[in-house]
Design a protein with these regions (language model features):
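Domain-level signature for soluble enzymes in the chorismate/prephenate branch of the shikimate pathway
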Residues: 1-192
């Protein structure tokens, strides 16, 4: 049995899709999994402000359309990217085992209190404003490694990333930045 998994092309998306493929192969004897790698509108429009252009659906719509057209059997998303309501005809069929749910404050080396924090997430901005009331916020886009490079280079003093994504990519340190996991009372993670 061949199962086609629709996924984004980012390194984290591919790691997560391979994890799903491994679970499917373990659960379904003889299953072969193939990844259908899709570039989404959110990937293509790196200059857009996500909150002003459609938010989460920018990273999921093309994968969902591939399902509806019968080009894929499964779409693999980070749960934080799912819209509040599922597209008619689609269901959430499963989840990967739970990872560390905490967010990680990524500080440029030498910075203790960030003056500028780069995050495109309104949820994270609101929570970080409580911790750093004098900080200003800027948008940041790109894959995890791109974001880490931007902070190390001084684009902003800090950003915030999901510990789960860092763990799945095997990133536990990075030159020029310090990882500071946030307690759940400091930063409530995304649903899922």
């Amino acid at each position: 049995m061949k199962i086609i998994l629709a996924t984004r092309k980012s390194p984290l998306a591919l790691v997560q899709a391979e994890m799903v493929a491994a679970h499917l192969r373990g659960a379904i004897p003889g299953a072969e999994c193939e990844l259908l790698k899709i570039v989404t509108t959110g990937d293509q429009q790196a200059g857009w402000s996500l909150s002003k252009q459609g938010g989460k659906g920018l990273f999921t719509a093309e994968l969902e359309q591939a399902l509806l057209r019968g080009e894929a059997d499964v779409a693999v998303h980070s749960c934080k990217d799912l819209p509040g309501e599922m597209v008619a005809g689609l269901v959430v069929a499963g989840y990967l085992p739970r990872e560390d749910v905490r967010d990680v404050l990524v500080l440029r080396e030498g910075v203790t209190t960030p003056a500028t924090i780069a995050t495109s997430s309104p949820r994270r901005q609101m929570q970080l404003k409580r911790l750093f009331p004098s900080a200003t916020f800027t948008e940041i886009r790109g894959n995890v490694d791109t974001r880490l490079k931007k902070i190390a280079a001084g684009t902003a003093d800090a950003t915030i990333l999901a510990r789960a994504g860092l763990n799945r990519l095997g990133i536990h340190s990075w030159a020029g930045v310090i990882f500071s996991p946030l307690n759940l009372d400091e930063s409530v993670p995304a649903v899922g």
